[in-house]
């Protein structure tokens, strides 16, 4: 599985956990996989890492939102932000610009017209604080 695909599956797992309120990364990841597709270490670490650090990640996002509340952001955008912030804060081997670019590409696929600009702005602010 390519890293882009793993990130997309991770975003879908975070989306699912947000909607259901269930923070079970194993089940959420399994529900995103196509038939015959297997998870990989990168995907598992993204979803499991988010669950482990959810409070810290959400607080970091809140501190960098201007005129928005985390709870009012669309679930898709919130999931993309959470995934990217986890990657930026806890996966130091991945350059921040790569993470931001990947988040923007995922937003183009899953978000609305404004998602990519919004996500780029928030993540750029967060990058400056890390």
Swiss-Prot record:
One of its GO terms (molecular function) is RNA binding. CDD domains: Terminator_NusB (cd00619). InterPro entries: NusB-like_sf (IPR035926), NusB_fam (IPR011605), NusB_RsmB_TIM44 (IPR006027). GO terms for biological process: DNA-templated transcription termination; transcription antitermination. Keywords: RNA-binding, Transcription, Transcription antitermination, Transcription regulation. The lineage of its organism: Bacteria, Bacillati, Bacillota, Bacilli, Bacillales. Involved in transcription antitermination. Required for transcription of ribosomal RNA (rRNA) genes. Binds specifically to the boxA antiterminator sequence of the ribosomal RNA (rrn) operons. PANTHER family: ANTITERMINATION NUSB DOMAIN-CONTAINING PROTEIN, N UTILIZATION SUBSTANCE PROTEIN B-RELATED. It comes from Bacillus cytotoxicus (strain DSM 22905 / CIP 110041 / 391-98 / NVH 391-98). Disulfide bonds: none annotated. This is Transcription antitermination protein NusB. Belongs to the NusB family. GO terms for cellular component: cytosol. Pfam families: NusB (PF01029). NCBIfam families: nusB (TIGR01951), PRK00202.1-1 (NF001223). It comes from the Bacteria.
